[in-house]
């Protein structure tokens, strides 16, 4: 697949963003169920905001290291965002009013409060995180049925090369 050198893809779909400097986003892009590193799922956009670890700990429950060249500590934010997006999608909530866009917007706490109020059953943020994980796992089962598996969870090889300036 010579073309992949010039047209980077994930799971057969073109990639919309180079994730060399955003490792949580790279993990999310590689493992997203939509392929292509779809910007509407698994994008821990807070990583681009260079928030200190104390701030991300308040938002997602764990500190996120700020080293743009390290994958250390970047898996959980990708999982957290994938689950948040899955729950938001299930509730019909536009991505642009959630923490996907900005840390001050809607998240699991808000979703739990709304779902509890509407259904009369108590939902906790932790329970909704579990719901998001189940949605994600079900989507992964569809991918497996269609012949995709862990070997397809990768960023394009080109994204492992150093940054270059100018036309590449």
Predicted feature locations:
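Extended C-terminal regions of large enzymes
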Residues: 1-168
């Amino acid at each position: 697949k010579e073309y992949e050198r010039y047209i980077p893809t994930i799971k057969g779909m073109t990639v919309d963003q180079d994730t060399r400097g955003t490792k949580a986003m790279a993990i999310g892009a590689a493992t997203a169920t939509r392929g292509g590193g779809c910007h509407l799922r698994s994008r821990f956009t807070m990583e681009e905001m260079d928030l200190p670890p104390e701030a991300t700990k308040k938002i997602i429950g764990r500190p996120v290291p700020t080293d743009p060249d390290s994958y250390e500590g970047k898996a959980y934010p990708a999982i957290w965002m994938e689950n948040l997006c899955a729950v938001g999608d299930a509730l019909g909530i536009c991505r642009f009013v959630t923490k996907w866009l900005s840390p001050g917007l809607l998240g699991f706490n808000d979703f739990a409060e709304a779902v509890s109020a509407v259904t009369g059953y108590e939902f906790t943020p932790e329970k909704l995180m579990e719901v998001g994980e189940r949605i994600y796992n079900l989507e992964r089962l569809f991918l497996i049925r269609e012949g995709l598996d862990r070997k397809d969870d990768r960023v394009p090889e080109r994204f492992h090369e150093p940054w270059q300036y100018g036309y590449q």
